[in-house]
Curated annotation (Swiss-Prot):
Keywords: Cell inner membrane, Cell membrane, Ion transport, Membrane, Sodium, Sodium transport, Symport, Transmembrane, Transmembrane helix, Transport. Its main location: membrane. GO terms for biological process: plasma membrane acetate transport; sodium ion transport. GO terms for molecular function: acetate transmembrane transporter activity; glycolate transmembrane transporter activity; symporter activity. Residues 56-75, 126-145, 206-211, 287-297, 382-401, 451-461, 517-549 are cytoplasmic. This is Cation/acetate symporter ActP. Residues 1-32, 99-102, 169-182, 235-263, 321-358, 425-427, 485-493 are periplasmic. It comes from Escherichia coli O6:H1 (strain CFT073 / ATCC 700928 / UPEC). Pfam families: SSF. PROSITE patterns: NA_SOLUT_SYMP_1, NA_SOLUT_SYMP_2, NA_SOLUT_SYMP_3. HAMAP family: Acet_symport_ActP. The keyword Hydrolase does not apply. Belongs to the sodium:solute symporter (SSF) (TC 2.A.21) family.
Length: 549
């Protein structure tokens, strides 16, 4: 049981233990011209792709789903590119650098939600939906209320994730490039808007694919050079790391991340079910032609991400040997220059020199751009498709819907820049944890039960979904992270850092209770419609494929 709890505790988002690069003050580094030049090459190339994509975006289908013409392999790379953030790359490597073996369990925790997506969600989501997961949730339920709830859940998750990414972008670029924080935030915001505004999902997908390839190449090269240093022997790798690490043999012992069983379960559930409720990830399943390609997308994405997180483990131990024991990378006080999250960046310099250091720094920036572009498109589609076209102005033309979507992109971009500047010196690490908790407590229960439970009604979905969302937010505010560390109170009202265990339970219980007690004629009609939905979800009958889907 203790091993299980250890593993579950390790599945929390990077924000809890690996967020020093995205929270508080950072030590600005000298201007890195190699990194800036390489990043400019990446920007010019991706803007060229955006121009190419803009010539092919002629309809709503093209803008939201790239015309449904992305292959399973391409989509798998894009999903991996959307999910593998710069903070997970630097943060997990830093956790292995400081804690050893626990970092491996931690990195594997990022994958626990993907079997759920593969076996329970991907195919049915593609067969039932068109542009957003709200299409699936509202398939047999009342369009208006369900779309409002789904859009609110999406927008809250997107907003929290976007703030964390923008602040993280500013901090990381200040660390890696030596650029001013405000310049970095504005640069990320402007590029993000350009990708999404002109290229839509097609440009966003290819930016994410390129970023994934660059990140996988860079991490593979670093891991190869580390293993070459130890004669391609894991025994030598671990022995040398234990010999130079201050904790010695203790870095090979698990369990250092466990606080208590409730926190472990709550964190584990939050990441596992939260992944299956992230709107910018779910949107990718509508970019492929059919359910078979959607399933292949998850298969490839899981493979790429699993490989990547194994590499971060090798990189972390390599940093212990080649960076931790090298005084060149320490300041006068004996601490790592720039903080522990710079371990992977310093290792890039140690194994590949200044040129490769510039490459890894540019890849870290590209990683942020790929993630924020996906978030922005998900937020814009929630407003334009779910709210505008299906609630506030039913029957809106494609042109009107696309105009609203692009206006939303501009508004989201400006808001993201402003909030990124305002939160510069705030501890925003909790925001990613809260985003996962809300995705797990509001989005995931509604998606899952709308596809699998025949007795679900609009009444149950609405009351249970809102209860889950509100519970997650309230418990997070009353918990130690916000109530004590940010608001300055002496003791937290809610004793646990992450609320997912409780808010998910409230959501599922609420959905079951209010659906089971719904005796209305509308509820009976919605239950009867489940059979037709089930047939389509299993067979794909009635789903248009390719460009016209």
């Amino acid at each position: 049981m203790k091993r299980v709890l250890t593993a579950l505790a390790a599945t929390l988002p990077f924000a809890a233990n690996a967020a020093d690069a995205i929270s508080g003050a950072v030590e600005r580094q000298p201007t890195n011209w190699q990194a800036i030049i390489m990043f400019l090459i990446f920007v010019v190339f991706t803007l060229g792709i955006t121009y190419w994509a803009s010539k092919r975006v002629r309809s709503r289908n093209d803008y939201y789903t790239a015309g449904g013409n992305i292959t399973g392999f391409q989509n798998g790379l894009a999903i991996a590119g959307d999910y593998m953030s710069a903070a997970s790359f630097l943060g997990i490597s830093a956790l292995v650098f400081t804690s050893g073996y626990d970092g491996l369990i931690y990195s594997l925790g990022f994958l626990v939600g993907w079997p759920i997506i593969l076996f329970l969600i991907a195919e049915r989501l593609r067969n039932l939906g068109r542009y957003t997961f709200a299409d699936v949730a509202s398939y047999r339920l009342k369009q208006g209320p369900i779309r409002i709830l789904s859009a609110c859940g999406s927008l809250v998750v997107v907003a929290l994730y976007l703030i964390a990414q923008m602040v993280g972008a500013g901090k990381l670029i200040e660390l890696l490039f030596g650029l001013n924080y405000h310049i970095a935030v504005v640069l990320v915001g402007v590029l993000m808007m350009m990708y999404v505004l002109f290229g839509g999902m097609l440009a966003t997908t290819w930016v994410q694919i390129i970023k994934a390839v660059l990140l996988l190449f860079g991490a593979s090269f670093m891991a190869f050079m580390v293993m070459k240093h130890v004669g391609f022997s894991f025994n030598n790798l671990f022995s040398e790391a234990m010999a130079v690490h201050p904790k010695g043999v203790d870095i090979m012992k698990p369990g250092g991340l466990v606080k208590d069983p409730i926190s472990a379960l709550s964190l584990g559930l939050g990441l596992m079910f939260g992944t299956a409720g992230l709107p910018h990830i779910l949107m990718h399943f509508f970019t492929v032609s059919d359910a078979r390609e959607a399933r292949k997308s998850v298969f490839y994405a899981t493979g790429f991400m699993g490989y990547f997180y194994i590499l971060t483990f090798i990189i972390g131990f390599g940093a212990i040997m080649l960076v931790g024991a090298n005084p060149e990378y320490k300041d006068a006080a004996g601490h790592l220059i720039g903080g522990n999250n710079m371990a992977a960046v310093h290792l890039a310099n140690a194994v590949g020199g200044n040129l490769f250091l510039g490459f890894i720094s540019a890849v870290a920036f590209a990683t942020i751009l790929a993630v924020v572009a996906g978030l922005t498109l998900a937020g814009a589609s929630a407003v334009s498709h779910d709210l505008y076209a299906n609630v506030f102005k039913k029957g809106a033309t494609e042109r009107e819907e696309l105009r609203v979507s692009k206006i939303t992109v501009l508004i989201l971009g400006v808001i993201a820049i402003i909030l990124g500047v305002l939160f510069e010196n705030q501890n925003i690490a909790f925001m990613v944890g809260l985003a996962f908790a809300i995705a797990a407590s509001c989005n995931f229960p509604i998606i899952l039960l709308s596809m699998y439970w025949s007795k679900l009604t609009t009444r149950g979905a609405m009351l249970g979904g809102w209860l889950g969302l509100i519970t997650a937010v309230v418990l997070m505010i009353l918990g130690p992270t916000i109530w004590v560390q940010i608001l300055g109170h002496e003791k937290a009202i809610f004793p646990y850092e992450y609320p997912a265990l409780f808010s998910i339970s409230v959501a599922f219980l609420g959905i079951w209770l209010f659906s089971a007690t719904d005796n209305s004629a509308e509820g009976a009609r919605e239950r009867e419609l489940f059979r037709a939905q089930f047939i389509r979800s299993q067979t794909g009958f009635g789903v248009e494929q390719g460009r016209a889907h």
